[in-house]
């Protein structure tokens, strides 16, 4: 049986924790930041866990 390929786009976006959950960054933090408030930018900088429903397809994309 051939080896499973890792989706490189998912590898760049998600990080797997020791418990098997995935971490991700917030959207809307790339550009056009002058019109956003400091509070909004600070909250968008935090890293959050992916929900359980969204983590199932990520597990298929990141087999190792």
From Swiss-Prot:
Q: Which UniProt keywords apply?
A: Chloroplast, Plastid, Ribonucleoprotein, Ribosomal protein
Report the sequence similarity comment from the record: Belongs to the bacterial ribosomal protein bL35 family.
Keyword Disulfide bond in the entry? The reply is no
Q: Where in the cell is it found?
A: Plastid, Chloroplast
GO CC: one term? Answer: chloroplast
In terms of NCBIfam families, this protein maps to: rpmI_bact
Q: Which molecular-function annotation in GO is an example for this chain?
A: structural constituent of ribosome
Q: What is this protein called?
A: Large ribosomal subunit protein bL35c
